[in-house]
Every structure is written in C-alpha cells, then in structure tokens.
From Swiss-Prot:
Cofactor(s) recorded in Swiss-Prot or TrEMBL: Mg(2+)
Protein family per UniProt: Belongs to the NDK family.
Signal peptide: none
UniProt-recorded name of the protein: Nucleoside diphosphate kinase
Organism classification: Bacteria, Pseudomonadati, Pseudomonadota, Alphaproteobacteria, Hyphomicrobiales
Gene Ontology terms describing biological process: CTP biosynthetic process; GTP biosynthetic process; UTP biosynthetic process
Catalytic activity: a 2'-deoxyribonucleoside 5'-diphosphate + ATP = a 2'-deoxyribonucleoside 5'-triphosphate + ADP; a ribonucleoside 5'-diphosphate + ATP = a ribonucleoside 5'-triphosphate + ADP
UniProt-listed SUPFAM superfamilies: Nucleoside diphosphate kinase, NDK (SSF54919)
UniProt xrefs under HAMAP family: NDP_kinase (MF_00451)
Gene Ontology MF terms: ATP binding; metal ion binding; nucleoside diphosphate kinase activity
SMART domains with a match to the protein in the record: NDK
Residues annotated as binding ATP: 11, 59, 87, 93, 104, 114
Intracellular or extracellular location(s): Cytoplasm
C-alpha cells in the first residue's frame, strides 16, 4: 500500500485549551507522522475558501467565525491509508457518537467545537494541503 498524505486542522477550541500536544500524541500513537505543522490565525477569507463547500449551509457563518476565533494548527500527516486512518483517529463529528480513545471523544467540547478537521479524500487532502503549505514546508 502506498504512503498517503492527509490534511489536519487542530481547531480553536483545542488550541485555546493548550491541547495541541494531546492531539499530536493521539495522532502519533496511531502511526501517523506529522511532516508539516504550523500555528496560524486563519483569516476570514481563508476560512471562507476552505469551507466553500458549505457556503449555502445555515451554519456557514458560524463555522467561519469559529475557525477565525483563535489560533489553529494546520498539519500534513503521512502514513499508509492516511486519510482513512486519520478520520478513524478523529472519531465521529459529534463527540457523543465518537469511539473511545479518539480525538473528539477525548477532547472535543461539542459537535461545533470538535477539536479537529481531517480531509475526507486523497484528492481533497491535496487541495487542502496546497491552501496552507508550499512544497518546501513539507519535510517528511
């Protein structure tokens, strides 16, 4: 099986509570390598572009506001089946439905403030990675 890359965001609810290390520990324990990482303040334009697929949804404005409410940590993760593996490690979007030991079960505050984003496909991962990283910033 080929090595894949996926994109991750540690969301403002987690960074506000200084949980970056806790999230990274779950990621690395699951066998995903962090090959790029930076802490940023996402701009409104970045958030609107990133979540454009949800622009017609009623929660879009709140999502953009939340994602720009504090620092986020954007990451590139690498492993065999990285996309599926990270989605499993994150857990269900609603932390109440997330499996034990997942990021969202352990750390999320709510369905909105669920601590982590992960790409849903290899194709979307490539697009999402390119929005935040240049090639020389990925050092896997």
């Amino acid at each position: 099986m080929a090595i894949e890359r996926t994109f991750s965001i540690i969301k403002p609810d987690a960074t506000r509570r200084n949980l970056t290390g806790a999230v990274n520990a779950v990621i690395e324990t699951a066998g995903l390598r962090i090959v790029a990482q930076k802490r940023i303040l996402m701009t409104k334009a970045q958030a609107e572009t990133f979540y454009a697929v949800h622009s017609a949804r009623p929660f879009f404005g709140d999502l953009v506001s939340f994602m720009t409410s504090g620092p986020v940590v954007v990451q590139v993760l690498e492993a065999e089946n990285a996309v599926a593996k990270y989605r499993e490690v994150m857990g269900a979007t609603n932390p109440a439905n997330a499996a034990e030991g997942t990021i969202r079960k352990l750390l999320a505050e709510s369905i909105e403030a669920n601590s982590a984003h992960g790409s849903d496909s290899v194709e979307n991962a490539a697009v999402e990675i390119a929005q935040f990283f240049s090639g020389n910033e990925i050092v896997g």
